[in-house]
Amino acid sequence: VSRALGAESIFLGDAEKDVVGTLEEVNRTWGGDFQVILGVPWRKVIQDSKAEGRNIVHLTMYGMPLQDEVAELRGLSKLLLVVGGPKVPGKVYHESDYNIAVTSQPHSEIAALAIVLHEIQSGEELKRAFEKSRLRILPSPKGKRVVET
């Protein structure tokens, strides 16, 4: 989801090593240069991102409503979106520049990520073309049309 909707990279825990091969194959087939970074502690990711001038945006159902903050987020040029699970350390809330809620009800972290990426980019990510793709889908009202590039 993050790759398809315009993210440049994703940080994952070591337990998710199998994702790397899958995403490398997706890059080869469908284009793009999406990066997967494994095993970097969350605190270091946030510290390094801040040092690079990124704004830290934590997606949580306990944050400020996305619709109230999205205009400000659109004005930021460098973002790190933090998506946690049910047991996010409290320090993440305090170290983030923004704590943003898609809704104040339980929901999927992936759904929140997709909605935030879509809203921040005003839907422009849906028009994105991926460079160096081996395959490309041609829109079709019925059936599947895939061409080799």
Language model regions located:
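RNA substrate-binding interface of SAM-dependent RNA methyltransferases
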Residues: 1-61, 121-126
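Long, charge-patterned amphipathic alpha-helical coiled-coil/hairpin "stalk" segments used as oligomerization
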Residues: 63-102
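Short, well-ordered alpha-helical microsegments
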Residues: 19-20, 43-46, 66-67, 89-90, ...
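Terminal targeting/leader modules
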Residues: 145-149
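Short, solvent-exposed amphipathic alpha-helical segments in soluble enzyme
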Residues: 1, 27-28, 72-75, 97-98, ...
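Structured adenosyl-cofactor binding patch, chiefly the S-adenosyl-L-methionine
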Residues: 92-144
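Short secondary-structure transition/capping segments
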Residues: 21-26, 69-71, 112-114
